[in-house]
Structures are given as C-alpha cells and as structure tokens.
C-alpha cells in the first residue's frame, strides 16, 4: 500500500501518477481501501464499531477527529448496507471475528476508494455475511468506478463482478 520500501525501487504508476512525482504516502492511501486477515490486530485499543468504521474516513487506526453530521450519516449508511448497524455502539474487541471482519470491510468502503484491496475478506465470515459482501461488491462494480483487487483461496468466495483472474499454483 505504497509504504512498502520495495515500492520505491520499482517503476510504479498509481492513479495515473508515476512514483516520485510529488505524491505522499497519504495521498496514495487516501484512494485505497484495504482489508487483510491481520488488520484487526491494529485495533487493539478497541473503541466502538462505529468509531472503527469512521476511522476509515481518515486512514487512521482510531478516531481522532470529530465527525461532521455528513460523515456520521455516511458511516451509518455503510453500516446499514453491510448489515452491521446493530454493532455501532458495541466494542470492537467484544464482537466475533466475523463481525470484526465485516466492520473492517465497511471501514474500507466508507471512503469510497478508487481501489479496494480485499485479501481473504471472507475468512471468518458465515454464509450470510459472505453473500452480503459479494452482493455489495457486485453492486459497486456495476455502479461505480472502483477497481477491486480480490484475493481468495476459494472460488466460491469470489463475487461475480470479478472479470479477470490470476491463479497461482504450486509447482
């Protein structure tokens, strides 16, 4: 996500800008939503699920700013879309792993990223959560300019909007 040192030794173009053209890591991260299997480990302080989702608006691991009414409405909207609005006031540390994953996916979506990177997003999700995620991603693919990079070990977890695949096989 642009903060890897290897990114600086390669000829990389992100969002139509060549590396070294004046963009900061924060400029790049602002355009990327990201979820990985270990992301929940960075939220040890907990806080409410609402604040974890809201932190996605600022690319922070915690909420350090007051939200405008518009930002609050956006967080509430995305929590409803993802079916987790009932978790808003619950502590992030006190919910199940699948619920944490849904909160973090919602955090990645709340800022409407140009690039959404989901690394094993269905890990820990039940069937209902998985289907909801796939439905939301299919809708976004059809109705937005967002690019989706989706990593999964299982074909059944891949949303139908994925139109290009790369399969890595062990030799």
Predicted regions and their residues:
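ABC ATPase NBD Q-loop/coupling interface
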Residues: 5, 11-27
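Conserved catalytic motifs of ABC-family nucleotide-binding domains
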Residues: 112
């Amino acid at each position: 996500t642009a903060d890897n040192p290897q990114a600086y030794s390669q000829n990389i173009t992100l969002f139509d800008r060549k590396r070294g053209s004046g963009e900061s890591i924060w400029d790049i991260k602002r355009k990327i939503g990201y979820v990985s299997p270990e992301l929940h480990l960075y939220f040890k302080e907990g806080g409410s699920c609402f604040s974890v989702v809201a932190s996605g608006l600022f690319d922070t691991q915690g909420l350090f700013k007051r939200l405008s009414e518009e930002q609050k409405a956006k967080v509430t909207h995305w929590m409803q879309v993802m079916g987790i609005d009932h978790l808003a006031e619950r502590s992030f540390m006190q919910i199940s792993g699948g619920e944490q994953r849904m909160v973090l996916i919602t955090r990645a979506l709340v800022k409407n990223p140009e690039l959404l990177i989901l690394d094993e997003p269905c890990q820990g999700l039940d069937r209902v959560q998985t289907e909801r995620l796939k439905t939301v991603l299919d809708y976004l693919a059809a109705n937005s300019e967002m690019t989706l990079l989706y990593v999964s070990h299982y074909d059944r977890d891949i949303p139908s909007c994925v139109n290009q695949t790369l399969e890595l096989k062990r030799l």
